[in-house]
């Protein structure tokens, strides 16, 4: 874990990571739309990445402004002192080894330093393992349940939770 570093990603790093995601997913058009959404909202988001020996292995995005053009279900999820966390990703071979937890702690500390007092996130009800992790991290205040819609027309049910920091 000594070679693992957490940081705020540059635009170059964000592009590199999106190109990696595009390369490993079959539905290229959907992932191209996710990339476009991310890049057009950079002024409203902070992207955090975990690097292990020059490889991006974890990432998470904090949406910090309600001006974000693509965030869905914004009501009660984002505000002046409230950030919405999304796009939690860990490369498969590094899951369950504590890397994402370290990135999450780095991100929470940074957002608190920036004046945020609460964080929100969304999780599908079927993602039991993730729900347990988020509860352990303090995301135990239920906010609401809504559908999120993907660019390809699919929809998924999402429960939203909040944590005070």
Locate predicted features.
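Active-site rim helix/loop that mediates acceptor-substrate recognition in acyltransferases
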Residues: 24-53
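A short helix-loop-beta-strand connector motif used in the catalytic cores of GNAT acetyltransferases and
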Residues: 39-50, 58-59, 67-68, 84
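Conserved acyl-donor/pantetheine-binding loop and adjacent beta-alpha core of acyl/acetyltransferases
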Residues: 60-87, 148-153
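Conserved acetyl-CoA-binding loop-helix of GNAT-fold acetyltransferases
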Residues: 90, 96-109, 136
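Conserved GNAT acetyl-CoA-binding A-motif
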Residues: 111-122
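Conserved acetyl-CoA-binding loop of GNAT-fold acetyltransferases
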Residues: 134-144
């Amino acid at each position: 874990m000594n070679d693992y570093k957490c940081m705020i990603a540059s635009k170059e790093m964000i592009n590199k990571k999106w190109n990696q995601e595009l390369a490993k997913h079959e539905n290229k058009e959907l992932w191209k739309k996710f990339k476009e959404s991310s890049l057009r909202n950079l002024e409203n988001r902070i992207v955090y990445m975990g690097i292990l020996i020059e490889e991006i292995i974890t990432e998470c995005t904090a949406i910090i402004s309600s001006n974000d053009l693509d965030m869905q279900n914004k009501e009660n999820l984002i505000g002046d002192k409230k950030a919405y966390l999304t796009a939690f990703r860990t490369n498969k071979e590094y899951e369950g080894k504590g890397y994402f937890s370290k990135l999450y702690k780095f991100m929470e500390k940074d957002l608190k330093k920036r004046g945020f007092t609460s964080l929100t996130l969304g999780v599908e009800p079927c993602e039991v393992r993730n729900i347990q992790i988020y509860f352990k991290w303090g995301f135990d205040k239920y906010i609401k349940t809504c559908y999120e819609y993907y660019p390809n027309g699919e929809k998924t049910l999402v429960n939203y939770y909040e944590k005070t920091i």
